[in-house]
């Protein structure tokens, strides 16, 4: 294994350990020492890979983008097929509802309010998600030969807001034990718009 491969594997290990710490303690309660200990590396080694906690948080934004990439690729490949766009929405909702993802979403939102660099990195992911969904929604309308009730960008924003707000409620612990209060897949289908 080459040195570059080992460095990349170590960075992945550090990032996974940091994510576990962030989910358990939050960004501000997690120290670089906590991350080094969780990753099983020395503090010096950690600083060789990441100059500080903000760099790790920015790497989380890159990891989020990479995790979303396959979903977005499938959405692009849907070519306006309503059922496939609905599958994307359900898959994205399932991803956002994962406990770790939901808890991290709360942390990201709070950190984004305080740190413009973090806000910019995660906003880029959101813009990509919204733009890709808007394009798919436009194709759905064209395929079904209908005029959308909302502009595709606004419709995409409403759909993503519904999904992400459900995840934030979970991350805040407001939705524990209330599966009935969860975002209904039927609502996503309704927000997707009527067929022609």
Which residue stretches match the model-derived regions?
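Short alpha-helical functional segments enriched in proximate histidine and acidic residues
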Residues: 21, 67, 95, 132, ...
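N-terminal intrinsically disordered/low-complexity leader segments
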Residues: 1-9, 20, 141, 196
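Helix-turn-helix
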Residues: 13, 17-55, 59
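Short alpha-helical elements of helix-turn-helix
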Residues: 11-12, 16, 103-106
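Hydrophobic/aromatic-rich alpha-helical bundle segments in the mid-to-C-terminal region
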Residues: 119-123, 127, 141-191
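Hydrophobic alpha-helical connector segments
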Residues: 59-62, 72-102, 152-159
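Amphipathic alpha-helical segments used for helix-helix packing
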Residues: 84, 96-120
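Amphipathic, non-transmembrane alpha-helical scaffold segments
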Residues: 57, 61, 65, 119-130
């Amino acid at each position: 294994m080459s040195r570059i491969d080992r460095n990349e594997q170590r960075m992945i290990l550090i990032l996974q350990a940091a994510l576990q710490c962030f989910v358990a303690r939050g960004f501000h309660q997690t120290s670089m020492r906590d991350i080094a200990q969780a990753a099983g590396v020395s503090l010096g080694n950690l600083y060789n890979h990441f100059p500080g906690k903000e760099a790790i948080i920015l790497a989380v934004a890159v990891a989020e983008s990479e995790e979303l990439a396959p979903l977005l690729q499938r959405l692009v490949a849907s070519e306006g097929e309503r059922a496939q766009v609905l599958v994307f929405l359900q898959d994205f909702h399932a991803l956002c509802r994962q406990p770790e993802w939901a808890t991290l979403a709360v942390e990201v939102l709070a950190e984004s309010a305080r740190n413009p660099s973090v806000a910019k990195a995660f906003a880029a992911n959101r813009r990509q998600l919204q733009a890709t969904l808007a394009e798919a929604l436009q194709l759905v309308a064209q395929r079904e030969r209908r005029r959308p009730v909302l502009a595709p960008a606004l419709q995409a924003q409403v759909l993503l807001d519904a999904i992400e707000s459900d995840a934030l409620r979970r991350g805040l612990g407001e939705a524990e034990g209330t599966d009935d209060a969860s975002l209904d897949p039927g609502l996503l289908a309704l927000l997707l718009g009527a067929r022609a």
